Curated annotation (Swiss-Prot):
Membrane topology type: Multi-pass membrane protein
Single GO cellular component term: plasma membrane
Protein's UniProt name: Uncharacterized membrane protein YhaJ
Main subcellular location: membrane
Organism: Bacillus subtilis (strain 168)
Length: 172
């Protein structure tokens, strides 16, 4: 196996650019989802109760995001544990390109529609669900950037996760 490309988002884009783009993407998604909600349910009065529940739901959504990332990879059973001194760090070895793409995009495609449906189901608290959806979309931005880089890789490529990024491997 040869390394076709190494992807490290911090080196490629920089932390400030990623954060700034993520914040802009959060705002864009919040505005678009809230406008879509207002078009579907005009004149709904919004309630500012349950702010603590909003915070708790946000934490749960970010945890569910991580779990959804891992599910496609676990289905392929490609997990290898490496020990680094006292800490154990899980790394993924030889993940097929399509599995990795599904793993990167699936949290956004699964969680965002659920949040929008929750906004429609609970219209008085729709702004909370739209905010969580926007925050989650910003949290997904690095996944989208990785997916864009992976799309350009050869079809038969494999992905190795390293401590500082991803390696795209191709067979000789």
């Amino acid at each position: 196996m040869n390394c076709w490309k190494t992807i490290n988002l911090m080196k490629d884009y920089g932390a400030v650019r990623i954060i700034l783009t993520a914040v802009c993407f959060m705002i864009l998604v919040f505005i678009s989802t809230f406008l879509a909600f207002e078009l579907l349910r005009p004149g709904t009065s919004l309630s500012d109760e349950y702010v603590s529940l909003f915070g708790g739901l946000l934490v749960v959504i970010l945890f569910v995001h991580k779990v959804i990332h891992v599910l496609p990879i676990i289905c392929k059973k490609r997990k290898i544990e490496k020990k680094f001194y006292i800490l154990r760090m899980r790394t993924w070895k030889r993940i097929p390109k399509t599995t990795m793409l599904i793993s990167l995009v699936s949290p956004f495609l699964l969680i965002t529609p659920v949040l929008f449906y929750a906004a429609l189901a609970f219209p008085n608290h729709a702004h909370y669900f739209c905010m969580i959806s926007g925050i989650h979309a910003g949290y997904c931005l690095p996944d989208f950037l990785l997916a864009l880089k992976l799309i350009k890789a050869p079809k038969t490529a494999f992905i190795d996760q390293e401590a500082d990024g991803l390696d795209i491997l191709v067979e000789k």
